[in-house]
Amino acid sequence: MSTEVSPATAWSLAFLTQLVSSGIQHLVLSPGSRSQALALAADALSQTDPTGLQVHVCIDERTAGFYGLGLAIHTGVPTVLLCTSGTAPAHYLPALLEAKHSGVPLIAVTADRPVELRGVGANQTTDQVGLFGVGVHASIDTPAPEANNRLFDGAAARASDLFRLAMSGAKGGRPGPVHLNIAFREPL
């Protein structure tokens, strides 16, 4: 049995570690298969330092969005909303719009299929790139991490950028929501 870590797992751990280092305290998880690397990394981080990241599991994405909004209002720090691919991300939109209008920092992280599996008619595939439109300050689509590529170097930088954008807005304005769509290849 191999103990090698998949690129998805390594990238997810680097990304979430940097978000926690930036000040993230809460992550609201709506689990699914495509987001499992991120979910497992979040769980590992919360187990390593129970005073650091708190992971809240919420099966319904719409409820998760508003729960995360409440946490961000209460703490004044961005809360991460994390879900799988398909129709799941669409349920975040009402909470993201509330966050934008209220100046509340939220970071929506959506797992997605790699680019070669998008738009091919697979079950529940949804075009997640730009899904939230004007409801977020910024929307970023990240290619699937692969072994031995420079994307690992960019995971921490991407996390820092998202935190900054959520706190100050994409154009230096007020806090609000941002979206990161991350493609993952199998093995997840």
Model regions and ranges:
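N-terminal alpha/beta PP-like core and its mobile active-site loop of ThDP/TPP-dependent enzymes
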Residues: S2-L188
